[in-house]
Design a protein with these regions (language model features):
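Alpha-helix N-cap/helix-initiation motif
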Residues: 52, 56, 156, 160, ...
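Surface-exposed loop/turn segments and immediately adjacent short secondary-structure elements
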Residues: 36, 48, 52, 69, ...
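Short, intrinsically disordered, charge-balanced linker/junction segments flanking boundaries
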Residues: 1, 283-284
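Active-site-proximal, well-structured secondary-structure segments within enzyme catalytic domains
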Residues: 1-18, 29, 61, 66, ...
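Active-site recognition of the HExxH zinc-binding catalytic motif
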Residues: 68-75, 171, 251, 256-281
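Signal/transit-peptide handling
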Residues: 48-50, 217-219, 264, 275-276
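Short, charge-rich amphipathic alpha-helices with coiled-coil/heptad character
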Residues: 30-47
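A ubiquitous short alpha-helical element
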Residues: 23-29, 49-55
């Protein structure tokens, strides 16, 4: 993927790594060059923060001011209370209390992990302190030392299509629904695939789009969206939903399939769970 990025950028002699998670994460995990790890992580964490024409600080301040104004127009003190009003937590105070309850045990666990990672770092670089760009690299070393497990060795078992088919099979076993790939459907990008979802009797559950690969202009991360919501109209007709799962997994290259990390597998199943929520909705 890094070679293809370089070719696309007009540098066929090079390898191009970018501040995208799918690009720089393997570098942070496996690159022995500490300075390169630092450079990539800093490039990622300081995006939009260089006091130039692409700087976002003023935009963020303005965005937050507008969110506060919007919340107050609706009678709420802050944006968090406004957003949470129809959620289980109800308000920011409840969320803060929950976060406080997990803070101490989480901090203890993080310090315990950092201590183990520092030991490994000290073996390689005596006198150096653990830094953010060391964390993933030495986590991989610790995993190999403790469990003789290299995440890269797991990836061939998690080819993207196999993982997605596994998710479909699980949904079939749990809910009795089937997934049929549809060819020739209108899509906004050639990489997008479309599936018709039906019950055992052939009745329509909904339509699922999947858009799994990064590309220029696409937002990072993974999410589910409703393209068309499920609803029952005034005549009692149930309109079935159109749902999309979006990800940014490693794109297959010439002769090489898209192989997922364990974290990627969890992400795919997580977003597929949201898709099932949307597909199986029978709200009025």
């Amino acid at each position: 993927a890094a070679k293809e990025e370089a070719v696309a950028a007009g540098r066929p002699e090079a390898w191009l790594f970018t501040p995208k998670r799918t690009s720089f994460t393997p570098v942070l995990q496996y690159c022995e060059n500490r300075e390169l790890r630092k450079e990539l992580l800093m490039a990622y964490t300081t995006r939009g923060n260089h006091d130039n024409e692409n700087d976002n600080k003023d935009i963020i301040v303005k965005t937050m001011q507008l969110r506060v104004e919007k919340a107050q127009l609706f009678g709420y003190t802050n944006p968090a209370d406004y957003i949470l009003a129809d959620c289980m937590a109800k308000d920011a105070k409840t969320v803060d209390a929950f976060l406080e309850s997990v803070w101490e045990p989480s901090l203890k666990a993080a310090k315990r992990e950092a201590k183990e990672l520092q030991k490994l770092l000290s073996q390689d670089l005596p006198g150096e302190k653990l830094q953010p760009w060391d964390w993933w690299f030495y986590t991989e070393k610790l995993r190999e030392a403790k469990y003789d497990l290299n995440e890269e060795e797991l990836k061939p078992y998690f080819e993207l299509n196999n993982v997605r088919n596994g998710a479909f099979q699980l949904a079939h076993e749990l809910f009795g629904i089937n997934f049929e790939k549809l060819e020739g459907m209108p899509v906004y990008n050639p990489e997008v695939e479309v599936f018709k979802v039906t019950y055992a009797d052939g009745s329509l559950v909904g339509i699922l789009y999947t858009d799994y690969f990064p590309r220029a202009g696409k937002r990072p991360g993974a999410w589910m969206n409703n393209i068309c919501n499920q609803y029952v109209d005034a005549n009692g007709v149930d309109h079935r939903p159109v749902i999309i799962n979006v990800g940014n997994f490693n794109k297959p290259t010439q002769g090489n399939p898209s192989l997922l990390s364990m974290d990627d597998v969890e992400t795919l199943f997580h977003e597929f769970g949201h898709a099932l929520h949307g597909l199986l909705s029978k709200a009025t």
